């Protein structure tokens, strides 16, 4: 299994989740958001970056792990307003983290719900089977944030 992440940090420790809440978790929980393609990783970063904060370059992390039967959250299982009601997705993701039943959870992107992202549970026993195998530095294309 190959997953992708754009980050300033080359680790899968989920420290950022301790400091800030995200779409699928409340603050105080270690979690890493991953994408199934490099393009969807870039889309998520662009959505969360203002045009004034566009970095001159970014690092794309290629993450490999075992092929797993990964549980998924379907948009059909979510209320119609899930994209605007953060408590719905945060409750679901935080509950998943606390149960610690799987290392990954596939979730729909709030930007393009037909695209799936993966939540990575660093505390799960299988987390050690995932590793960053490549870090690729790219210049950031300014056309994204015009």
Residue ranges, per PLM feature:
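Active-site and NAD+-binding cores of ADP-ribose-processing enzymes
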Residues: 2-17, 25-27, 53-146
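Short secondary-structure capping/turn segments at boundaries of alpha-helices and beta-strands
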Residues: 19-21, 47-49
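Extended catalytic/binding region for NAD+/ADP-ribose chemistry, centered on the ART fold
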Residues: 26-48, 118-123
């Amino acid at each position: 299994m190959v997953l992708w992440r754009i980050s300033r940090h080359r680790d899968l420790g989920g420290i950022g989740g301790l400091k800030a809440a995200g779409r699928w978790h409340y603050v105080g929980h270690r979690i890493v958001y991953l994408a199934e393609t490099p393009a969807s990783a870039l889309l998520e970063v662009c959505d969360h970056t203002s045009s004034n904060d566009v970095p001159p370059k970014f690092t794309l992390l290629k993450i490999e792990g075992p092929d797993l039967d990964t549980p998924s959250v379907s948009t059909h299982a979510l209320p119609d307003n899930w994209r605007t009601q953060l408590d719905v997705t945060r409750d679901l993701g935080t509950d998943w983290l606390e149960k610690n039943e799987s290392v990954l959870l596939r979730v729909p992107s709030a930007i393009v719900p037909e695209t799936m992202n993966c939540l990575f549970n660093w505390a799960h026993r299988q987390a050690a089977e995932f590793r960053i195998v490549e870090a690729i530095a790219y210049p950031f294309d300014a056309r994204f944030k015009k």
